[in-house]
Amino acid sequence: MTLSFTARWRDELPATYTALLPTPLKNARLIWYNDELAQQLAIPASLFDATNGAGVWGGETLLPGMSPVAQVYSGHQFGVWAGQLGDGRGILLGEQLLADGSTLDWHLKGAGLTPYSRMGDGRAVLRSTIRESLASEAMHYLGIPTTRALSIVASDTPVQRETQETGAMLMRLAQSHMRFGHFEHFYYRREPEKVQQLADFAIHHYWPQWQDVPEKYALWFEEVAARTGRLIAEWQTVGFSHGVMNTDNMSILGLTIDYGPFGFLDDYDPGFIGNHSDHQGRYRFDNQPSVALWNLQRLAQTLTPFIEIDALNRALDRYQDALLTHYGQRMRQKLGFFTEQKDDNALLNELFSLMAREGSDYTRTFRMLSHTEQQSASSPLRDTFIDRAAFDAWFDRYRARLRTEAVDDALRQQQMQRVNPAVVLRNWLAQRAIDAAEQGDMAELHRLHEVLRQPFTDRDDDYASRPPEWGKRLEVSCSS
């Protein structure tokens, strides 16, 4: 089967990009590719043949129909207007046309200098490409909207960051790379007609059902807000901290995008800061819902030339509704509740308080809770708490709440185990794979990818364990 590519972004939004070719790396070689995703997309196996060099995965060749561009956008970074940004090291190679008529962006990260590189070198490093590949695939298999990773190429090109690292490229796939920052760019350039063109493009290609509706723009922004709310709810329930929620890292389609200084909670710490550059804690775990709303308000401002203020405010209210509704549903599922009762939030908050006091492991606590039996006053979870009396008091109330529902243990446990993962991408697991890969051993990278494809399967190895001493509080930054 021949892959078919289109260039809708390039053809329809000429003011939003610069056309250019990738700059290949020295002695580039394919070290990992997503065989499952490649099969789904009918990508010929021959494209991954190492005897052909790095090929399209390393920017050495293009596939028929590809028309590479680097996109321009702007944004607020850490709450401050940063002006023009753009694809400083990434190039949108083309949009794959799928059988159902939809498209999928092929975006090559680390593809070399662009007009938007600013003071950067246009490169990505092996460390960051491995982290993004693992994180995006982990999120996908957790059921959270995200970009996807298709391939990683390593090289002999040295790249200077805090230390000298190895240059690499990541092929990232997404339904769209349209960001809040695209709209901000033209709004602050006082080109409202181009802001409206972006909205028209989004509606035409992703919400065509509203194309001929008079209030299409208000309906569209309402859905953007709702998708963002549901996404943030998913992050909070699984314990994911993005680390750098700048407006240019926010997806119009409600996808998790731009994995940098992210982290999944180990110990439950609502004030967890994943990014060691975030000195004020703006993007700490428990502030993500507020930041997402702030970012939506910045997007709403760009839409004021063609959406009434009342409609924008209604959409922002929709964000709050979607966030709280989805979060409530997810947390009830994590606790094994099939109905909503007035004391559920209090019960959840009591558990969170206990976990925060004791430094309980977020993922393991909920996974162990999913094995609870209504009639048993004992729980393996009890042994993880120092204050047994406090846990016992909470657990008695929890079991009493379970008994208010006519659901047997087997069904409830099954539901809980579908939403409480046994495995998440802890930073130490990613670091172990990175350390091996930097020594030329890709086995752990491949093994970890396989493990992350089955996050809801119980394991008795260290992929499901708490981090070792060296793996606690690993510092990560925006440098990639």
Curated annotation (Swiss-Prot):
The keyword Nucleotide-binding applies. It catalyses: L-seryl-[protein] + ATP = 3-O-(5'-adenylyl)-L-seryl-[protein] + diphosphate; L-threonyl-[protein] + ATP = 3-O-(5'-adenylyl)-L-threonyl-[protein] + diphosphate; L-tyrosyl-[protein] + ATP = O-(5'-adenylyl)-L-tyrosyl-[protein] + diphosphate; L-histidyl-[protein] + UTP = N(tele)-(5'-uridylyl)-L-histidyl-[protein] + diphosphate. It holds the Pfam family SelO. Its cofactor is Mg(2+); Mn(2+). Belongs to the SELO family. Nucleotidyltransferase involved in the post-translational modification of proteins. It can catalyze the addition of adenosine monophosphate (AMP) or uridine monophosphate (UMP) to a protein, resulting in modifications known as AMPylation and UMPylation. This is Protein nucleotidyltransferase YdiU. It comes from Salmonella agona (strain SL483).
